[in-house]
Amino acid sequence: MSAVAPRSRLSLYLDLIRWNRPAGWLVLVWPTLAALWVAADGFPGWHLLAVFVAGTVLMRSAGCTINDIADRDFDRHVKRTTQRPITSGQLGVREAALVGVVLTLVAFVLVLTTRWEAVAWSVPAVLFTILYPFTKRFFAMPQAFLGIAFNFGIVIAFAAVQGRVPATAWVLWLANLFLVLAYDTEYAMVDRDDDLKIGMKTSAITLGRFDVAAIMGFFVLCLGLTAWVLAPYGLGWPLWLGLGVAAAQVAWHFTLIKDRTREGCFTAFSKSHWIGAAIFAGVALGYLLR
């Protein structure tokens, strides 16, 4: 471990887990909370709320660490990522790996306070999180794999509340898989030129000139599946208002990404968590007023 002042070391750890960019974990928190509310048929209680908020943030942070370790040689050639702690040499791989392990263990301890079914589902969640960065070497749509990894929180939420994973959970999982495909393709559009040079595979490269149309299609599938699976739950106008606000944001995203500028695509990605927030607000308010 290099001789770096403790305050500076903490700053590097926070940079490693993207603590200064909450959009990255908010895109995961909102769908997970919406699933938790549906699974519990309303407010799930403070214990589960705390477990899933903290667990989601911890696992996303661990995922960032794993991603940076796996991509450290590629990140040197990407304009946006050259100064990340591992890539720039400010943190060693072993030290970063230790950070990731600690974060994962803390998240696992939190899950242990729930049902064993939730604990069981947390194992593949960790495995997919570890494997995701390596799919960018050979899989044409690694964002789809990311969607699988990101949305285990939905499955685990139902397992923690109900001790099972019903069809509703899987439809919500699929809906949010499309949401991840949408916003992470926006993110991939930011780095497309650099990724082409270094041979990285992304959905933005695979989709080519159909990228914007595909993103809009992914958003529509997300909202459509969410509306379809939640309509029977009697959540009334709050659900439809939330979905309407989310749809309005999708329209705004189109204006941001249609010209494919780095700035517009990054803005779209960084604001994408508001779509999940609108849906969660509709679900939570619907249960409150039901």
Curated annotation (Swiss-Prot):
Keyword rRNA processing annotated: no
GO molecular function: 4-hydroxybenzoate polyprenyltransferase activity
Keyword Heme on entry: no
UniProt cross-references to InterPro entries, sorted A to Z: HB_polyprenyltransferase-like (IPR006370), Prenyltransferase (IPR039653), UbiA_prenyltransferase (IPR000537), UbiA_prenylTrfase_CS (IPR030470), UbiA_sf (IPR044878)
CDD domains per record: PT_UbiA_COQ2 (cd13959)
Main localization of the protein described in the UniProt heading: membrane
Enzyme kind, highest EC tier: transferase
Pfam families: UbiA (PF01040)
Gene Ontology biological process terms, A to Z: ubiquinone biosynthetic process
Biological or metabolic pathway of the protein: Cofactor biosynthesis; ubiquinone biosynthesis
Function: Catalyzes the prenylation of para-hydroxybenzoate (PHB) with an all-trans polyprenyl group. Mediates the second step in the final reaction sequence of ubiquinone-8 (UQ-8) biosynthesis, which is the condensation of the polyisoprenoid side chain with PHB, generating the first membrane-bound Q intermediate 3-octaprenyl-4-hydroxybenzoate.
This protein's name: 4-hydroxybenzoate octaprenyltransferase
